[in-house]
From Swiss-Prot:
Keywords: Hydrolase
Annotated PROSITE patterns: NUDIX (PS51462), NUDIX_BOX (PS00893)
Occurrences of domain Nudix hydrolase (ranges): 6-149
Gene3D superfamilies: Nucleoside Triphosphate Pyrophosphohydrolase
Sequence motif Nudix box, residues: 38-59
Enzyme class name: hydrolase
Keyword Hydrolase listed: yes
Main function: Accelerates the degradation of transcripts by removing pyrophosphate from the 5'-end of triphosphorylated RNA, leading to a more labile monophosphorylated state that can stimulate subsequent ribonuclease cleavage.
Family: Belongs to the Nudix hydrolase family. RppH subfamily.
The protein's name: RNA pyrophosphohydrolase
NCBIfam families per the UniProt record, alphabetical: PRK00714.1-2, PRK00714.1-4, PRK00714.1-5
Region feature Disordered, mapped onto this chain: 167-190
Length: 190
């Protein structure tokens, strides 16, 4: 389902734990890390799509999370032609996304990357909040920056940490890589 401009409606999920670290998933059989995300089906609201994608990709149910906020508007990114399926070329430009900020109220052990027969991730880890900006594929970086900045205001409002909002060019850059943050342990699906 594409909109008139050629963008597929989609939801993105920033899931945080009690330390405000973000869930970071490794795409199956690739060395690409990203946040959970997925398309909105016809007749589905963004919230319904978010809960469906959360279960399909991370194995979590609504009772495992609390919604802290969402982006106000659609955030768009264009997908380079070489990533677009042949049958979509000429029509498909990219994704438009509503991003949700969720707090895990369950346990790490509630995460199940094999909740469906078509898993998206084969490993996951908790990462510092801004690390994904340095590790995500380039064409998604601006949307990640917008989503993380907008939702950081909600997440960090009580801690006065919004002064660390990341800027694409001028902000501080982390030297952490997905293999070196937090506890240094990736969770492998099995």
């Amino acid at each position: 389902m594409l909109d008139r401009e050629g963008y597929r409606p989609n939801v993105g999920i920033i899931l945080v734990n009690g330390k405000n670290e973000v869930f970071w998933g490794k795409r199956i059989r690739e060395h690409a890390w990203q946040f959970p995300q997925g398309g909105i089906k016809y007749g589905e609201s963004p919230v319904q799509a978010m809960y469906r994608e959360l279960h399909e990709e991370v194995g979590l149910k609504p009772e495992h999370v609390r919604i802290l906020g969402r982006t106000r508007d659609w955030l768009r990114y264009n997908v380079p032609d070489h990533f677009v399926r042949r049958e979509w070329r000429g029509h498909y430009k990219g994704q438009k996304q509503i991003w949700f900020l969720l707090r895990l109220v369950g346990r790490d052990s509630d995460v199940c990357l094999r909740a469906t027969q078509h898993p998206e991730f084969d490993a996951w880890r908790w990462s510092q909040y801004w690390v994904p900006l340095d590790a995500v594929i380039e064409f998604k970086r601006d949307v990640y920056t917008q989503a993380l900045n907008e939702l950081a205001v909600i997440l960090f409002r009580r801690h006065h940490e919004t002064r660390y909002l990341r800027q694409r060019v001028h902000g501080p850059r982390s030297t952490d890589s997905p293999s070196s943050e937090t506890d240094g342990h990736a969770h492998i699906a099995g």
